[in-house]
Each structure stands twice: as structure tokens, then as C-alpha cells.
Amino acid sequence: MKRKEIIDDVTMKRAITRITYEIIERNKNLDNIVLAGIKTRGVFLAKRIQERLKQLENLDIPVGELDTKPFRDDMKVEVDTTTMPVDITDKDIILIDDVLYTGRTIRAAIDNLVSLGRPSRVSLAVLIDRGHRELPIRADYVGKNIPTSQFEEILVEVMEHDGYDRVSIIDPS
């Protein structure tokens, strides 16, 4: 198994900052935004974007934590650990995840969202888009596009969970 670091902590911070600026530029009413981090690492990324929005725009944007496992078609988990601090009805939701791959996690996240309320709009921000979609889903905000083979894996590590800020490609061969 080979591991190659492709994004370090500085590059990751820049990508998150770029996503934050794009969110500011594309959303006329920032007061209507709710960030929804997809567990696990998407939550930490959402909190970082929330912090940058506070620094740049002096806004306190709510952050929810979406558990997609009960909504996936490839596993069955009974307990839903989703937390959403506000009613999402008529809100502009920005889903945040670490890696966009097949699109199945995002589909499950959207199913979870609509079980909570009826947002006016849902968009998607991801740190890494690696391609290989199985569903017609695309990200609105992308930190980095990193094409991979289907055999490779992308490993995102964040300081809050893993002790490092980095992204690596794992080649199992």
C-alpha cells in the first residue's frame, strides 16, 4: 500500500478559505444560510467555514451535523445522530463533506435533510472532488479537483479528529 500526500495543512487552509469566499460571493442573503456538515470530517470542515465566515463577515452561521448512515442504501443503522440547531424550512442549506466520489453519501444527506424540513435551496461544498460519479450530483463549491483511479482512495485527515491536516492518495497495489 502506497501513500502519497497531495495536500498539506497550508494548502488545506487555503482551499477552505477559497470555499468560504465563494460562499460569500454567491449568496446574497448570508443570514439565511445554514451549514450542514456530513459526519464525520464534513462537520469539522463546516465548523472551519463557520469560523471564517465569522472572521470575514461577522456572521454567526448555524452548523448542523448530518448522519447519513440511516439514509444510505448500502447499510442499515437505526440510530440517527443528526443534530440541527435551527429549523431548516425556507433556509439555504450548504452541505459540506470532505470527499465527493460516487454521490451516494450526498443523496443520503439530502434524504436526511428533507426529513427535517423543506429548505429553499441546497448546495454542496466539498474539499475534494475525485470524480467517478454514480449519481447525477455535482459540487457547487470545490476546494480541489483530484482525479483518481477507482482503485485509489482519498484519505482526508483533519486536526480535530486525526491530529493532522492533510490529504493523501492511497494506492492499495
Swiss-Prot record:
Its EC number is 2.4.2.9. GO terms for biological process: DNA-templated transcription termination. It catalyses: UMP + diphosphate = 5-phospho-alpha-D-ribose 1-diphosphate + uracil. InterPro entries: PRibTrfase_dom (IPR000836), PRTase-like (IPR029057), PyrR (IPR023050), PyrR_bifunctional (IPR050137). One of its GO terms (molecular function) is uracil phosphoribosyltransferase activity. The keyword Chaperone does not apply. The keyword Iron does not apply. A motif (PRPP-binding) lies at residues 93-105. It comes from the Bacteria. Keywords: Glycosyltransferase, RNA-binding, Transcription, Transcription regulation, Transcription termination, Transferase. Coiled coil: none annotated. Homodimer and homohexamer; in equilibrium. Regulates transcriptional attenuation of the pyrimidine nucleotide (pyr) operon by binding in a uridine-dependent manner to specific sites on pyr mRNA. This disrupts an antiterminator hairpin in the RNA and favors formation of a downstream transcription terminator, leading to a reduced expression of downstream genes. NCBIfam families: PRK05205.1-4, PRK05205.1-5. Belongs to the purine/pyrimidine phosphoribosyltransferase family. PyrR subfamily. HAMAP family: PyrR. This is Bifunctional protein PyrR. It comes from Streptococcus agalactiae serotype V (strain ATCC BAA-611 / 2603 V/R).
